[in-house]
Regions:
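Hydrophobic alpha-helical bundle cores within soluble ligand-binding/oligomerization subdomains
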Residues: 1-366
């Protein structure tokens, strides 16, 4: 029997051509292209094309003018439900019954609808929908999203969201991507795989940490002393959000490109964030010189999204939008392998027992 590996950590379950997180060198490449060369240079819609097709064009198409059919008051619930409903509405067929070209087209249609649904749900029912004629004036997928959500977005905010989505578009075998591949491996339709991935993303251990960085920033703005805050937090056994990563043994490359972009866009909280980062890295190194605890993507993602006036409760939804690119690429790659993902579990429960040994048997036995 194979060795038991809790959480499957370190287990190689797939071979992929999509992304290469270089944990030692602190770099992240999408099909060989470093994200340093993508963020701020190639828009998210074309990065979707790179990840899915290996080419920038045609990229992600505009979303179809389809109103979101669910209004629960929770963006994740709305998007996850609405995605699943695309299958009967559009007549999506199981991946098992279609070829790769059809799967790719289905993924493009469904993935961009996820962005549309996030924007529509975030706008809410209290405001009228933005006319399609206004949305069609946009020059990029990200700008279309922002117009659908807000009506007239600040161009700098569009650049900030584009940078974040590109940097967070794909990151190898994480929980939501694994979920998408498992569902795809069953031969289910693409909407089912995307919907399942959205559910996995909703867990705070995967998609919920960036919003927690803002609390630290706000406290330092109040006190004006980043070093004192860091020392007090660590002395109290608190975790500094935005530092350390399970993959990288060097600085998270996504943090690096988002820091650069935040400075280029003159984000108001850049200096406070930079002071916190410097104080945290110095104190963490002093206390744990044997460990590499560098800045991760969550830290500067929070600064970028805050700059773009994205409310904290939407941070996970924005992460979801970004990761639709990686999910789409992995779903298509899994479709091409054609192999069902079926790991094993080692039984460690009780041995053979008589029902009479189970508590409550006397109450239910006839």
């Amino acid at each position: 029997m194979s060795d038991f590996v809790p959480g499957l950590e370190g287990v190689v379950a797939f071979e992929t051509e999509i992304a290469e997180p270089d944990k030692e060198g602190g770099s992240l490449r999408y099909r060989g292209v470093d994200i340093e060369d993508l963020v701020g240079h190639v828009s998210f819609g074309n990065v979707w094309g790179l990840l899915v097709d290996g080419a920038f064009n045609p990229g992600l198409p505009p979303a179809e003018p389809f109103p979101i059919p669910v209004h629960s008051g929770d963006i994740r619930v709305d998007v996850q439900s609405a995605l699943a409903m695309l299958a009967p509405v559009w007549g999506l067929k199981p991946l098992l019954d279609i070829d790769a070209a059809q799967a790719r087209d289905d993924l493009a249609r469904a993935a961009v609808m996820a962005l549309s649904y996030v924007a529509q749900s975030a706008r809410g029912q209290g405001l009228p929908m933005v006319p399609q004629s206004e949305i069609d004036k946009a020059e990029s997928i990200v700008e279309r999203f922002m117009i659908r959500w807000r009506g007239e977005p600040d161009p700098k905010h569009v650049k900030a969201v584009d940078a974040y989505w590109t940097s967070a578009a794909e990151h190898g075998m994480n929980a939501s991507t694994f979920t998408a591949r498992v569902i795809a491996s069953t031969g289910a339709d693409v909407a089912a795989a995307l919907s399942g991935a959205v559910g996995a993303m909703s867990g705070p251990l995967h998609g919920g940490a960036p919003s927690r960085v803002l609390g630290m920033i706000e406290e330092i703005e109040r006190t004006g002393d980043a070093t004192a805050y860091v020392k007090r937090a660590l002395d109290n056994g608190e975790r500094l959000m935005g530092f350390g990563h399970r993959v990288y043994r060097a600085e998270d490359p996504r943090a690096r490109v988002l820091r650069r972009t935040a400075k280029e866009l003159d984000a108001p909280r850049f200096e406070v964030a930079e002071a916190l980062e410097k104080a945290a890295l110095e104190e963490l190194h002093n206390r744990r010189p044997d460990r590499v605890l560098a800045t991760n993507v969550e830290f500067w993602a929070a600064i970028m999204l805050d700059f773009a006036e994205v409310p904290a409760h939407m941070f996970t939804s924005m992460f979801t939008c970004a990761r639709t690119a990686g999910w789409s690429a992995h779903i298509l790659e899994q479709k091409r392998t054609g192999r069902l993902v079926r790991p094993s579990a080692r039984y460690v429960g009780p041995g053979t027992r008589n029902p009479r040994e189970i508590e409550g048997f006397e109450d239910i036995a006839g």
